[in-house]
Amino acid sequence: MEKCEGIVIRQTSYRESDKIVRMYTREFGKIGVVARGAKKTKSRLAAVTQLFTNGYFTFFGSNGLGTLQQGEVIENFSSIQQDIFMTAYATYVCELLDKATEERQPNPYLYELTFQILRDINEGYDPQILTQIFEMKMLPVLGLYPTMDKCAICGETTGHFDFSTSSNGIICHRCFEKDRYRMHLPENVVKLLRLFFIFQLDRLGNIDVKPETKEWLQKAIDTYYDEYSGLYLKSRKFLREMDKWENMLKKDSDD
């Protein structure tokens, strides 16, 4: 019997009343378990196997799918559950984590990062910025290491910088002419990309970012992911549609 602290990142129906639950845990990394009877509303496993739930879990099995025996909810992130926009961002965070990681490869830092991102989304901090931070932090997990601390071409650490997918990182103004595919990003956007990649989440604090800056950030991150990650996530496509609707709603309310 194994015990762990984990976050439910995916759940699927299995048979008439069971679930297959995918969790990212502090102790074991990503694992899958069968939760028997969890689809029944009165089941003792119903609450603890809800998507995004953070809890303590006890299960049998060390290889393949285990069998969940019991669980205790630590945090269910109820605000996320009740808000369609928060849900969309949190779903993407969990799907990205799921697709980027292998079974049973523990990474306590990644567990803590995911928990902090979901907690901050739940507490009402900007979900788009938090998700962008998560996307940048996930690059090394995917085996991607853009050069963000110096010019990817000449190695200079000072000057004006832009971001380039073809050069795999930032490039300084001295090298702009050497890379015609650079993104022509505003300087503050490049600074934020560097911060998101390098600094720990708890050092970044609550960042207030203008809508147009967030759009530039998303363009850069999406372009890099499309070029290098090989991931095509349904939740990301849905999230981009949600962003369009949210922007339209905000525009109507401002008018």
Curated annotation (Swiss-Prot):
It comes from the Bacteria. GO terms for biological process: DNA recombination; double-strand break repair. GO terms for cellular component: bacterial nucleoid. Keywords: DNA damage, DNA recombination, DNA repair. Coiled coil: none annotated. Gene3D superfamilies: Nucleic acid-binding proteins, Recombination protein O, C-terminal domain. It holds the Pfam family RecO_N. InterPro entries: ARFGAP/RecO (IPR037278), DNA_rep/recomb_RecO_N (IPR022572), NA-bd_OB-fold (IPR012340), RecO (IPR003717), RecO_C (IPR042242). Involved in DNA repair and RecF pathway recombination. Belongs to the RecO family. NCBIfam families: reco. This is DNA repair protein RecO. It comes from Listeria monocytogenes serotype 4b (strain CLIP80459). The gene is recO.
